[in-house]
Amino acid sequence: MRDFYEKVLGVVSAHTGFSEHQILHDRHEMCTDARYLLVHFLSRHLRCNEIVHLTGLSKQAVSQICNGYDARARFKYSLRSTAKSIEFELFG
């Protein structure tokens, strides 16, 4: 579980150019997008409470990201484009 988290975090960090701290704590829009990407890919293999434990984000924040990812991605080409690159690197 921890290995998967670190792998996803590393790939998201590499594709977005933000550090772990920035991804998890910064309020800038691009960092928020990176956080959405991180939680989106983690949620494919981990339950909400596991994501909360690994990231230190609140359960409410994780739920909001999981439930709001599709709407955010629908309107942001950069988010969709980065997600495709990350998905290819993580899952082939």
Q: How would you name each of these model-derived features?
A:
Residues S43, C66-N67, A73:
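DNA major-groove recognition helix of helix-turn-helix
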Residues M1-S19, A83-E89:
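Conserved alpha/beta core segments of nucleic-acid transaction machinery
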Residues E50-T55:
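Short alpha-helical "recognition helix" segments of helix-turn-helix
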Residues G10-Y36:
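Short, Lys/Arg-enriched anionic-surface-contact patches
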Residues R72-G92:
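Short Lys/Arg-enriched helix C-cap and helix-to-coil transition segments
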Residues A34, H45-N49:
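Residue-level signal for the short linker/turn that defines the boundary of a DNA-recognition helix
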